[in-house]
Amino acid sequence: MVIEKIWFHRHPLGYLLWPLLWPFSVLFGVISRSRRKAYQTGDKPSYRAPLPVVVVGNITAGGNGKTPVVVWLVETLQNLGYRPGVVSRGYGAKAPSYPLVVNEQTPAQHCGDEPKLIFQRTKAPVAVDPVRSQAVKALLEHGVNVIVTDDGLQHYALQRDIEIAVVDGVRRFGNQELIPLGPLREPVSRLDEVDFIITNGGVAKANEIAMRLQPTDAVNLKTGERCAVSKLTRLCAMAGIGHPSRFFNTLRELNADLVHCQGFADHQAFDAAQLNQLAQQGAHLIMTEKDAVKCAEFAQPNWWYLPVSAQFAPEAEQRIVDKIKEVMEPYGSPSA
């Protein structure tokens, strides 16, 4: 996409569009700062949940690897004996009504690809609502004792106890300009206020926690069969995520026999005819797990997805766990 080249690769068109886009970036900054201040001062009401809230988000537009962090966090909380629930706005989806609590039968087009993936991976209660406080209230009926929000760092209408920002360690912050001139939702200085900065790939800085996405074997969408990526011949790869090239590079690192790579927009909806035509360019079609939740109902026998999991150094993982325990302590024991 041209806009990504302008944001992250200093495309010449960016210099031509600068006079046009810069005033809108200034306006965006003024509005976002005044909006946040209104919540901080109480001029706008914010919701304080009766249980701890952990926000996982970012300061840039596009995918940074938040969802694997949310999955890791939920599984970690479950292993500690807590009962986490996840809230999301369900970006790119439209539910018949809100709040929507995700279950096995909920189609991804109603809840969103990321909430569906999180539910399938963790089996934790997941509630979707553009108004996140309403999603939290829906989860209170499901016996949860800690809330994890998928995205929502800028959703100041919901108060939080811990903020985790995920940064793309390769692309970082691009030209460091606010939307629409650059990718930033908030200035880079906003990261000085969060509890943890997790860097996905690249080289983590001194105040950041390095994360790597660890892939497993490919999984067949129809049968659930597992197979090493290197054993699948003539792969056609597709990715409808914020940074498709990251997925394709992961496949190359696994010695995949790639014959074609096709990137799509993040959260893009797919249909059977579109992907059947794409799959004809190879012997097998492989996609991200996030794409797979949208394609399962019309999947073909030669379609696969590649699960990935967030991994941290043990000491970094312990830092996050210790902070969670500290915040959770006033609310009682995990079984309370």
From Swiss-Prot:
Pfam families per the record?
Answer: LpxK
Question: Which residues does the annotation say bind ATP?
Answer: 60-67
Keyword Hydrolase in the entry? The reply is: no
Enzyme Commission code(s) on record: 2.7.1.130
Q: Which reaction does it catalyse?
A: a lipid A disaccharide + ATP = a lipid IVA + ADP + H(+)
An annotated GO BP: lipopolysaccharide core region biosynthetic process
> Pathway, per UniProt?
Glycolipid biosynthesis; lipid IV(A) biosynthesis; lipid IV(A) from (3R)-3-hydroxytetradecanoyl-[acyl-carrier-protein] and UDP-N-acetyl-alpha-D-glucosamine: step 6/6
Q: Choose one Gene Ontology CC annotation of this protein and give it.
A: plasma membrane
Specify the domain of life of the species encoding this protein. Answer: Bacteria
- Gene Ontology molecular-function annotations: ATP binding; tetraacyldisaccharide 4'-kinase activity
Keywords, A to Z, come to:
ATP-binding, Kinase, Lipid A biosynthesis, Lipid biosynthesis, Lipid metabolism, Nucleotide-binding, Transferase
Q: List the disulfide bonds.
A: none
Q: What does this protein do?
A: Transfers the gamma-phosphate of ATP to the 4'-position of a tetraacyldisaccharide 1-phosphate intermediate (termed DS-1-P) to form tetraacyldisaccharide 1,4'-bis-phosphate (lipid IVA).
Give the similarity note. Answer: Belongs to the LpxK family.
Task: Spell out the NCBIfam families in the cross-references.
Answer: lpxK (TIGR00682)
Q: What is this protein called?
A: Tetraacyldisaccharide 4'-kinase
Provide the species name.
Vibrio cholerae serotype O1 (strain ATCC 39315 / El Tor Inaba N16961)
